[in-house]
Amino acid sequence: MKLRIFEIVFAAMMIASIGGATAAGAQSSPAREPVAPDSGPKTLLEGILGSTEKDKGKEGSDGEEHLDADRPHFPEATTTVGKGRAILESGYTFTKKGDSFLSHTVPEALLRVGMFADWFEFRIGQDTLHQRQTVEEVTATANGAKDLYLGVKLALTEQKGWLPATVVIPQMTVPTGSAEVTAGRVLPGVNVDFGWEVIKDVFNIELLVANNFVQDELGNSRHELATGLTGAFQLTKKLELFAEWDAFYPTAGASPASRHYAVAGAVYFVTPNLQLDMRAGVGLNHNSNDFLAGVGFAARY
């Protein structure tokens, strides 16, 4: 009988020892961090040259960042939306020059869709124009849909030190607009955007160099070089303030003089996938409009 009791006690002690060792081992072993799924190269250069293991380890380490919309800055974002994601942007802009010029543009709709790879983005946009212009006491109006915008954005490089993040946007408008507004022809162009994160999560610099054919005041097409330089300050995780200098340099056509604007605004991130924006600006020379203002939003899906 005593032997039987001893065997039972011994067996219980062995079971308890094994269970304790297992629990201790589980507690001492560090929990494995979830491995981020491989979403492929973020830029075209990375897709060609490949990424390092160090770069891969950085992916997915933080929570989802807020969307990087093209609006309301004149320079576009130096990121693409990502494969399988989409961003819809929309807004309204009011422009005025004394009593001689007044325009409203709405909805400034731009749909950006990530396709094929994280570095490739398809873009389609539509807008309407309501404009009144007086020249030598003769007033003309133009109202209706503008030409359809089509383009792609290619993320070329991410920032490496002082080398900027870079994207290129081949684009065009096709003559689908109303009779009073359409250019009546395809107008091609290409934008190149550069971005520097100077102080992480605090201060960014953006630069746009745009070469596009546009419609002039006489309805003819002309080449125009445009530049935009923006400084963006992230005051909090939800609030960004920015200031920029935008310039337009026609190379021919009815208005060969340049136009310059100083613009400032704010972006409020309601959620990581929704932002609201507002901006206002003034013309810096005689050829520019006196004042512009606008509001808008962007949503990521």
Q: For each predicted feature, which ranges?
A:
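Bacterial N-terminal signal peptides that target proteins for export
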Residues: M1-F10
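Absolute N-terminal positional cue centered near the fourth residue
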Residues: R4, A16-S17, S29
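Transmembrane beta-barrel domains of Gram-negative outer membranes and organellar outer membranes
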Residues: Q27-Y301
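C-terminal segment of classical bacterial N-terminal signal peptides
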Residues: I15-A23
